[in-house]
Amino acid sequence: MGETDNAPRGPPSFLPHKMNLLLRGLLLFLIGVFLALVLNLLQVQRNVTLFPPDVLSSLFSSAWWVPLCCGTAAAAIGLLYPCIDRHLGEPHKFKREWSSVMRCVAVFVGINHASAKVDFANNTQLSLTLAALSIGLWWTFDRSRSGLGLGIGISFFATVVSQLLVYNGVYEYTAPDFLYVRSWLPCIFFAGGITMGNIGRQLEMYERLALVEKSHRD
């Protein structure tokens, strides 16, 4: 009798987890789209937008897919970081609170703002400054080997993909100085990967703690 009563409990425990995973992915997607739009507005000051400004007023813009791609990438990164932590057996415990995550987002936006607002002597100085700021963001809010490795991998992959799109005429920047864009793009991708990874980790931890609390109540 006891075994019959306990048998059906497997699927219900799986379904909430799957639903929570989908909700977490959706939230990360929306955050990614929002940050893409905000960061684009910052770059408008230099006329170096990641997609034409009219995307804000029309879904039929020639680059309407760019913020959607950013949202999809943000969801994938945010879900991947906790999975890698579990796979490596290295749960991330450094500064695991929402206030730290919000500061990380603020620093990420600040790095983007610096690339748009501050005038550097040359592109090399811009690259070195943003690289130092991005590594500083990782050291301040992450400090994990998995975070550093994924950040570098994301930066390399995203930069290569963006350049291939430009070279093949699928996409183009609005700036005449293409070298300027390439100077800050890898650093922005790296910092963005670290930021979305921290958000994903925090959401996963919040979900895990909620499930543990619920199991204790039951």
Swiss-Prot record:
<keyword id="KW-0446">Lipid-binding</keyword>
<feature type="topological domain" description="Cytoplasmic">
    <location>
        <begin position="201"/>
        <end position="218"/>
    </location>
</feature>
<feature type="topological domain" description="Cytoplasmic">
    <location>
        <begin position="82"/>
        <end position="96"/>
    </location>
</feature>
<comment type="function">
    <text>Oxysterol-binding protein that mediates feedback control of cholesterol synthesis by controlling both endoplasmic reticulum to Golgi transport of scap and degradation of hmgcr. Acts as a negative regulator of cholesterol biosynthesis by mediating the retention of the SCAP-SREBP complex in the endoplasmic reticulum, thereby blocking the processing of sterol regulatory element-binding proteins (SREBPs).</text>
</comment>
<keyword id="KW-0256">Endoplasmic reticulum</keyword>
<feature type="transmembrane region" description="Helical; Name=3">
    <location>
        <begin position="97"/>
        <end position="119"/>
    </location>
</feature>
<keyword id="KW-1133">Transmembrane helix</keyword>
<feature type="topological domain" description="Cytoplasmic">
    <location>
        <begin position="1"/>
        <end position="21"/>
    </location>
</feature>
<feature type="transmembrane region" description="Helical; Name=6">
    <location>
        <begin position="183"/>
        <end position="200"/>
    </location>
</feature>
<keyword id="KW-0472">Membrane</keyword>
<keyword id="KW-0443">Lipid metabolism</keyword>
<feature type="topological domain" description="Cytoplasmic">
    <location>
        <begin position="142"/>
        <end position="146"/>
    </location>
</feature>
<feature type="transmembrane region" description="Helical; Name=4">
    <location>
        <begin position="123"/>
        <end position="141"/>
    </location>
</feature>
<dbReference type="GO" id="GO:0008142">
    <property type="term" value="F:oxysterol binding"/>
</dbReference>
<keyword id="KW-0812">Transmembrane</keyword>
<feature type="transmembrane region" description="Helical; Name=1">
    <location>
        <begin position="22"/>
        <end position="44"/>
    </location>
</feature>
<feature type="site" description="Required for the recognition of 25-hydroxycholesterol">
    <location>
        <position position="108"/>
    </location>
</feature>
<feature type="topological domain" description="Lumenal">
    <location>
        <begin position="45"/>
        <end position="63"/>
    </location>
</feature>
<protein>
    <recommendedName>
        <fullName>Insulin-induced gene 2 protein</fullName>
    </recommendedName>
</protein>
<dbReference type="GO" id="GO:0005789">
    <property type="term" value="C:endoplasmic reticulum membrane"/>
</dbReference>
<dbReference type="Pfam" id="PF07281">
    <property type="entry name" value="INSIG"/>
</dbReference>
<dbReference type="InterPro" id="IPR025929">
    <property type="entry name" value="INSIG_fam"/>
</dbReference>
<feature type="topological domain" description="Lumenal">
    <location>
        <begin position="169"/>
        <end position="182"/>
    </location>
</feature>
<comment type="subunit">
    <text>Interacts with scap; interaction is direct and only takes place in the presence of sterols; it prevents interaction between scap and the coat protein complex II (COPII). Associates with the SCAP-SREBP complex; association is mediated via its interaction with scap and only takes place in the presence of sterols.</text>
</comment>
<feature type="short sequence motif" description="KxHxx">
    <location>
        <begin position="212"/>
        <end position="218"/>
    </location>
</feature>
<dbReference type="GO" id="GO:0036316">
    <property type="term" value="P:SREBP-SCAP complex retention in endoplasmic reticulum"/>
</dbReference>
<comment type="similarity">
    <text>Belongs to the INSIG family.</text>
</comment>
<dbReference type="GO" id="GO:0006695">
    <property type="term" value="P:cholesterol biosynthetic process"/>
</dbReference>
<keyword id="KW-0153">Cholesterol metabolism</keyword>
<feature type="transmembrane region" description="Helical; Name=2">
    <location>
        <begin position="64"/>
        <end position="81"/>
    </location>
</feature>
<dbReference type="GO" id="GO:0032933">
    <property type="term" value="P:SREBP signaling pathway"/>
</dbReference>
<feature type="topological domain" description="Lumenal">
    <location>
        <begin position="120"/>
        <end position="122"/>
    </location>
</feature>
<feature type="transmembrane region" description="Helical; Name=5">
    <location>
        <begin position="147"/>
        <end position="168"/>
    </location>
</feature>
<keyword id="KW-1207">Sterol metabolism</keyword>
<keyword id="KW-0753">Steroid metabolism</keyword>
